[in-house]
Amino acid sequence: MGTSFVGYLTFVLLLLALTKVRGGPAYNSPLSSDLSDLKGLLERLEDRLPVEEVETPVQDIFAPNYDSADSSNSAPSLTVEAARPGADMMYNRGSWTQQEKSSPLRNKLRELLNAPRSMRRSSDCFGSRIDRIGAQSGMGCGRRF
């Protein structure tokens, strides 16, 4: 009787584990559907925007900023094109194609859509309440150096 009870309990636990695993794939989550809706909206917005020929220079946010006063430690300046030689090429459906020139507004919309969640939220650190407490005490994450 003890062996059959343990076997029955093991079988029930196995069934529970399998139902949790088959609960649903990640691509069917509500966040994924919201993301696909945003991508569709972005594509419709891109179709309505006029094509602009003026291109703004791309600034690398990870490149160090060198002070002109500190000339002893300054490195030779490199352009963005020299730092990333393949920046104008893009992998697209199995072949390398030249990336089309797009407007600055279109680039900003793409950056917003592709930005990680931590970059999109308005809070600087942990949340608005903790940021307010930190701002009052002068020790919070909202301070920028």
UniProtKB/Swiss-Prot annotation:
Keyword Flavoprotein appears in the UniProt entry: no
Cystine pairings recorded for this chain: C125-C141
Name under which the protein is recorded: Natriuretic peptides A
Keyword annotations from UniProtKB, A to Z: Cleavage on pair of basic residues, Disulfide bond, Hormone, Secreted, Signal, Vasoactive
Organism in which the protein naturally occurs: Aquarana catesbeiana (American bullfrog)
Signal peptide: 1-23
Propiece residue ranges: 24-117
Superkingdom in the source lineage: Eukaryota
Positions bearing the site annotation: Cleavage: R117, S118
UniProt PTM comment: Cleaved upon secretion to produce the functional hormone.
Gene Ontology cellular-component annotations: cytoplasm; extracellular space
Purpose: Hormone playing a key role in cardiovascular homeostasis through regulation of natriuresis, diuresis, and vasodilation. Has a cGMP-stimulating activity.
Family assignment from sequence similarity: Belongs to the natriuretic peptide family.
PANTHER family named in the record: ATRIAL NATRIURETIC FACTOR PRECURSOR (PTHR14066), NATRIURETIC PEPTIDES A (PTHR14066:SF2)
Gene Ontology molecular functions: hormone activity; hormone receptor binding
